[in-house]
Amino acid sequence: MDFLNHNYLSARASYDYTFNFWNDYLGLSTLVTKNSKHSVPQNPNSITESLKATLGLDDSPPCPCVMGEGDSGGHLDSCCCPPPASISILDLKERFSILSPFQNQNQGSLLSSSQEREIGIGGGFAGFDLFGVERKMRKPAARNKQEPKICVFCRNNGAPEEVYGSHVLKTPDGRVVCPILRAYTCPLCSANGDNAHTIKYCPLSKDQPAQRVLKGGRAVGGKRVKIF
């Protein structure tokens, strides 16, 4: 340890080991300078030049004949260089369409959709409205849900499921089809068959005084008729 400390102190006397932030210890500045000399300078107008090349615009220097005769006032008819090719409006539109590739697709999709609406798709499916058919299919389904497939009259009178599940009370046009209700004759209007109904639904029952029904189901002043 004494030997190492002695060498370190003797070397420190001849060289200052203090770290300097601004000193380039690795020589990076020399390396960067060499790379910058060998690298190709970038053109600041590279985007502009590529755009001109895409559009086919000529940015070449003028003809030397024009430069030589421009100051002398000579005629330009004797120029030896070929005249530049004329660019039409259609060519410019076609070249500018490269910059907006989605514009033509949108126009084509709008045109195709309008043509499909006019002439239809597939000939036989012309004017085929899928959503309209789906709505028409939903309406009967909803209507069928509202109409029970059982006889409410028989179920309310305590008939077994085999009986009230075998038929319905009425048809959609209001005709009574329940065999038990068809055999019943209304005591007020004597209606039966297709127009059969109970006293509760009889048109003449509005003129009769309402009977108070007890808990057992027997009306005051009357007897309960047990069908089942």
Curated annotation (Swiss-Prot):
PANTHER family found in the cross-reference section: NANOS PROTEIN
Domain observations: The Nanos-type zinc finger is composed of two C2HC motifs, each motif binding one molecule of zinc. It is essential for the translation repression activity of the protein.
Main location: cytoplasm
Chain's gene name: nanos1
Residues that coordinate or bind Zn(2+) 1: 151, 154, 167, 178
Keywords annotated in UniProt: Cytoplasm, Metal-binding, Repressor, RNA-binding, Translation regulation, Zinc, Zinc-finger
Record keyword DNA damage present: no
Motif position, C2HC 1: 151-178
Binding site for Zn(2+) 2: 186, 189, 197, 202
Nanos-type ZnF: 150-204
Name of the protein this chain belongs to: Nanos homolog 1
Source organism superkingdom: Eukaryota
Family assignment from sequence similarity: Belongs to the nanos family.
Short motif (C2HC 2): ranges: 186-202
GO molecular function: mRNA binding; translation repressor activity; zinc ion binding
One GO CC term on file: germ plasm
